[in-house]
Amino acid sequence: MASLDLPYRCPRCGEHKRFRSLSSLRAHLEYSHTYETLYILSKTNSICDGAAAAAAAAAAASGFPLAPEPAALLAVPGARREVFESTSFQGKEQATGPSPAGPHLLHHHHHHAPLAHFPADLVPASLPCEELAEPGLVPAARYALREIEIPLGELFARKSVASSACSTPPPGPGPGPCSGPSSASPASPSPADVAYEEGLARLKIRALEKLEVDRRLERLSEEVEQKIAGQVGRLQAELERKAAELETARQESARLGREKEELEERASELSRQVDVSVELLASLKQDLVHKEQELSRKQQEVVQIDQFLKETAAREASAKLRLQQFIEELLERADRAERQLQVISSSCGSTPSASLGRGGGGSASGPGVRGPGRMREHHAGSAVPSTYAVSRHGSSPSTGASSRVPAASQSSGCYDSDSLELPRPEEGPSEDSGPGGLGSRAQATNGGSERSQAPRSSGLRRQAIQNWQRRPRRHSTEGEEGDVSDVGSRTTESEAEGPSDVPRPGPAVAGPLNSCRLSARPEGGSGRGRRVERGSPSRSNEVISPEILKMRAALFCIFTYLDTRTLLHAAEVCRDWRFVARHPAVWTRVLLENARVCSKFLAMLAQWCTQAHSLTLQNLKPRQRGKKESKEEYARSTRGCLEAGLESLLKAAGGNLLILRISHCPNILTDRSLWLASCYCRALQAVTYRSATDPVGHEVIWALGAGCRDIVSLQVAPLHPCQQPTRFSNRCLQMIGRCWPHLRALGVGGAGCGVQGLASLARNCMRLQVLELDHVSEITQEVAAEVCREGLKGLEMLVLTATPVTPKALLHFNSICRNLKSIVVQIGIADYFKEPSSPEAQKLFEDMVTKLQALRRRPGFSKILHIKVEGGC
């Protein structure tokens, strides 16, 4: 249907906006226009009613028979509806074109539109048009009205018949029945009117029913809308609650997700800890097995040591028993010698004046010569007995001869008593070996028993001394005590050849001895006594007492624990202390530190250090600088000034030296010291050389490696700050690995050490157990991986001194080196930053130390990681 066929149009929009019903029009006005439009529409309906009445009057005046009267149309309620219907369709007729006449329109409606569509709200006659626009009406009631079908043709026909009957006046006077309002009441209604009224009543009833239904529908729709609104409100509240619950659930899900991630991380951490614990447990089991094996070895060693001690104690007991027997035999021989001496003195006492006269004379006549010869016979015959006599007097507490005899040189030879029987160079051999010599005179004077006693006693004494000299030397205290006793007896024999004022057994013997010495001189001379030169074998030897031997043995046990300075002071106490303090067995560990020494002093020590196995020179200083001597001249004059004395020490120690330490001796001991050690001490096992002025180079390392192949511990890191920091380089590390593949402990350092040299060192030294890095560049995880890839599988101790290291590098070392038992990190802020006093450097250094300290909380690091921070943080 086109828009012009619709019955209602909008008064605001015009003809182009038409509607099927008033409810649609009202809805359009309410939503498209303001409420004023509804008021205008109600007024327009009233005007339309007036216009319809005027149009009906005009049609009646024109003479159209079918046009009803306006009064009748307005008086009858149905007519009003018809007039309103005609006015409602007026716009439609105007839009379609002018109609020829009113009757044609009615005829058209009567024949072509028997039924007309009226709105339900216009059906009741008592409901005016103004009530349609009342503001009190519910909008839903106005929009929900429906159309009612009415038979318009029948109604118009009946209406026209009624109008014609009313318009024809009856004969007689007076106005007709339809002339006025007063004439209509007495007239009886016609059947058509009755039928019309009945139909109109039925239409009203039907319309009212429709309206009631519409009102119920409106109320129902309102209730439904209210219920829907309430339900929507409840649904919105429920939706908001659900949204809040959803947000809470989302947050809870996020929290659970985070907790899940934390639990997964914790689980992974626990798994890693379990792995580390398993590895640690395995390593502990392996260590336990090693410890058990080591314990079994130690137990075997203890058993062997106990057996050795028992055997040594048995040998010592037997040696003491033999020594006691030997001393008792010596005492018995001394007694016999005294008795023989008394016999000889009594035999010589018959002619004392002649002997003294011949001894004091200076002529070279025959009797003068024979006199000294006879005196020499008596002296030679009493040589051995006089020795024992001196021993007895020296051992007695009353004489104190051992304390009055001056100390002799300890380097004297170990000669035996046979030297007393040899002739002096000044004397002729005919006096001792000829027919009138010593042997024949002794036999003629003393008899056969006395003649055989002197050779027998001298032979026994010589055999005893040889047995002591051939005794094997050990480094134990028991063996060293024996060395002291042996050397004490031999040295006392040489020391007994002191001044001539040593007390003699008796005045009867002194005279013949002195006269013999004087007469033995080829140049002759006066009768006054003259001293024999020190160390001359013509003097009688002294045998020390057992008490002195025990005292020297006790001193030796004590002096082995004294340092070098104390030993030098102890040698100035007395002869016995001097003897023990300068015995080579005491100077096994030589330590010189914090002192000013010269080369001559070291050369003097060399004569006592023949058995030294450890030599330590630390922080030694040369002579003081002169007032007029410049620093350059002083440095040139003192450079290597102790190397000559060190060479004497090394030459004296020889193959006995096992440990050599030279540290903090700048300029006075250079790297030439290691070259000297390689020449003289080829049995070295531990070498330490640290210098700030002359660090070792690859040439010196090559020389040391060529001469000393048994070194297992090497400490050659330069001191910091070093005057030649690049001298110790990767080439030195490579040379160390080639020279000593069985190295166990090593200390290197310096700016010249790089990852290449460390990797080569780790590859060659597969048995390395202790590694110390001093002032090396930063050790990162990459450097640690490169070094551990080549070796260090058996490393037990890692020391990083002033060497920056990252926590990951330490973790890598701990994971690769299974036998690692200790990691020592000594760091300072100056090792990381050039400006340690700046706040940023201090803060970064504190963070680094905190990270390193955090490693101690990891499993396996708490007991092996030791961090030492210089100055604290």
Swiss-Prot record:
Q: Name one Pfam family in it.
A: zf-C2H2_FBX41
Residue ranges, compositional bias (Low complexity):
179-192
The UniProt entry's coiled-coil ranges are 207-349
Which of the residues bear the PTM Omega-N-methylarginine?
R358
**Organism the protein comes from:** Mus musculus
The gene behind this protein is Fbxo41
Sequence positions bearing Phosphoserine:
S476, S760
InterPro entries attached here? Answer: F-box-like_dom_sf, F-box_dom, FBX41/ZN365_Znf-C2H2, GenomicStab_NeuMorph_Reg, LRR_dom_sf
Mind listing the UniProt keywords for this protein, alphabetically?
Coiled coil, Methylation, Phosphoprotein, Ubl conjugation pathway
The Gene Ontology biological process annotation of the record reads: chemical synaptic transmission; dentate gyrus development; gene expression; hippocampus development; neuron maturation; neuron migration
Phosphothreonine PTM positions: T477
Point to the regions of Pro residues compositional bias. Answer: 168-178
Disulphides: none
Where is composition skewed (Polar residues) in this entry? Answer: 85-97, 384-414, 442-456
Signal sequence span is: none
Functional description taken from the UniProt entry: Substrate-recognition component of the SCF (SKP1-CUL1-F-box protein)-type E3 ubiquitin ligase complex.
What segment(s) does the record annotate as region Disordered?
85-110, 163-193, 345-540
Comp. bias (Gly residues) = 357-371
What is this organism's lineage? Answer: Eukaryota, Metazoa, Chordata, Craniata, Vertebrata
Q: Where is the F-box domain?
A: 548-592
Q: Name one GO cellular component term.
A: synapse
Q: How does it assemble?
A: Directly interacts with SKP1 and CUL1.
Q: What is this protein called?
A: F-box only protein 41
